[in-house]
Amino acid sequence: MKQITSTQEFMNVLDIRDDIIITQNPTQYVKLMEFSPINFELRSPSEQDAIISQFSSALRTFPRNTHIKIINTPSDVSSFIKDLRKKQAEEEQPECRAMQESQIEMLQKVSKTQGVTRRFFISFPYETSGGFRTSPTFNEIQSTLFKQGRSIQAALEACGNSTLSYESKEYTLSALYACICKAQSEAEPWDQHLSRIVEKYKEKFGEDVNLDRIPVTDFFAPEQIDSSYSPNYTIIDGKYVTYCYIPSNAYPTQAVGGWLSIFFSYIDDVSVDFWIKKEDPEMIQRRLQFELKNNRIKSRNIDEVSLDYDDLMNTLDAGYYIKQSIANGDDYCNMATMITIYGNSLDDMNDKFNEMREFLIRQDMALKRCTLQMDEAFRSALPFAGYNKKIFAKSKRNVMASQLGSCYPFTAYELCEKGGVFLGLNEAYGSPVFVNNFDTARYQNANMMIFGPSGSGKTYTLMCMLLRMRQQGTQIFVVAPLKGFEFKRACEAIGGEFIQIAPGQPQNINIMEIRKKDTAASDLIDGNTDSTRGSVLVAKIQQLHRFFSIIVPDMTATEKQVLDDALVRTYGNFGITHRNKSLIDPNKNGEYKKMPVLGDLHKELNNAGDDGKRIYNLLTRFVTGSARSFNQPTNVNLDNKFIVVDVSQLTDELLPMGMFIALDYILDKAEQDRTKRKVIAIDEMWKLMKASQLSAEFVVEVFKIIRGYAGSAVGATQDLGDVLANEYGAAIINNSKTKLLLPMDKKEAEAVSKVIDLTSEEMKKLKRTEMTVAAGTQKRRASNVLMVANTNHIFIKIKASKTEHDLITTSADDLAAQARRNAQLAAEHN
């Protein structure tokens, strides 16, 4: 009869106190730590060498026995979905709620079918340092493990890895659940699993049950393990599992840095266990002395032309090298590697095993199963820093600690920042990428720049990101100086406000308007500042001087004075003076008075004599001429959370003025509340940078000051050479801690590399063409974006839901298909 055994018996865990795992048979105290990886493959050769060297140094601080465990798991996006559900419940716009639901469905699908996350753990046991004391207290053990953990943490932080573990019992339980219960953890996230176990005990023992009263193995022991079918595999919770090892004589003779990553990067359904055992140097020296003596004696009796003589000389040289290395303070180590391969069926598991074995043969390595030792291999794979001696002996390879640096395993890179928005999938590993550019602990500022030539997917990437930021509750402002209509569908679909500024358009923003600001949040932070606040009118007139310098760029000092006097008189005609209280309309419950328009200023300039004549004449076009739509009161609403200002219908001559009006209005709104996130996005920024010097200066100002108002400035641009050659372009890049680079031609890639530090591999990928030819037409595949944030570089495949794609695509084929579908629906409706 087949035996199905509860794996509670396999755990050998007595308890978990704080974050210390206490095992039995034998009794051991083990600390488990988790570390984030780095994007090692995209580092330059010199950076890789430095990391390997640093890891070699780090190994000297490691305990005598160290277990490194790497697991591949489906990406857990439950916390991001939970946050999005919360935002959805608070959302007032029904259109936005529908978009949030679409994104949640996509995230659920991604986590089940595509997303893979690599997690990296280190476990090590408490070891006595000698002496007569054999019964240390738990506090002494915990203190020793804590110090060792801090030493490992500091050493790995020097390599670029940060710790992800928390010194708590619940974290340790969740980590063990992920490491041991692969099938369960894929079907039931930790939060749900924890709640189910606790509720089960509450039903049986009452409401006073807490985490400490429940046997710890209930949280991380699989439901069952069945090893009776075959000596070559076992079944754990319905998952087929085979444990394998790298034979001692099958390791690479010359290893490149990070070679250990080939095991968990080639196939998703694997985990890797790597043990490092430092041997006693005195014992090794005694053994070496004996072996060297015997080999020297043997060498005297062997002919120098014999093959045996060469082998013996090599052995002697290796022995002397080890002896000298130990004398220099290096550690003599034995390492061993075990690979666990999972499958949803027997055939699936065997196919993956054969695929991995053939892959390793091509790497001049070998892979063998732990035949007849599946239960022992299961116990060895538990992250308790232990191992089966027989399996270890089959796989062990001696190596000096200084050479172990090439085994550096923390080489994947995941980017799942708490509170971030989903951008897409990590191109290298398939894991989802969540970016929170507002995280001040990671980023000096929240600004972003998106670079790419025409047709590379800049606007697609920008709109995808902005829609998701809006779904997170962030206020979005977009200025579109080119093809603003591309934003219209997405804006309206999420319940936004689409504003077109152009001659003949009914919508208008009055540049003369002094807008009342909501200072409630600032007053809570700074106290009521009414008494110290400067004159609002003076600040407004200063802004208007900048605006009129666009209309009259060569204005003389006399004309500036005439303009200033005319502005003061114009506002005075409406009862507005330098006193801020004069702005209040006594008949409208604290609202501001009616504001002048350009036509009112035009009249004052007409009365200013010859010195005001030139400004008067140039302003006439905006009052009674073809651009008279600028001479209207404001009739748009900026209270919406997604606002697009389309200035693309303006001529090159009028564009700087339209841009100034739009950004002036948006900045007024953005500066009101320093506690709420907001984004000012400028698409096709090169258009504004070229429009005029003042336009470029204003854009730079936005990028510099927005951080102080809990904001982010996001720019998307082509014509990279011109922008980067411009002093203002360089200032914007310096004030943007995050850059997104899309595929570009050689010339543009080289221009970017001059201001952004890229490796040769990154340059190759950027210059790679993304065009495919089909049926005589060119179609661009989904863009792969290189995100450069601080020292981290990662290629991301932008992923949009079907709903999002239909709203933001600019592909003629996609739009034609949408038009056909809409026409068909209309015909069916009629």
How does the language model describe each region?
Residues 103, 108-110, 129, 151-157, ...:
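P-loop NTPase motor core of the ASCE superfamily
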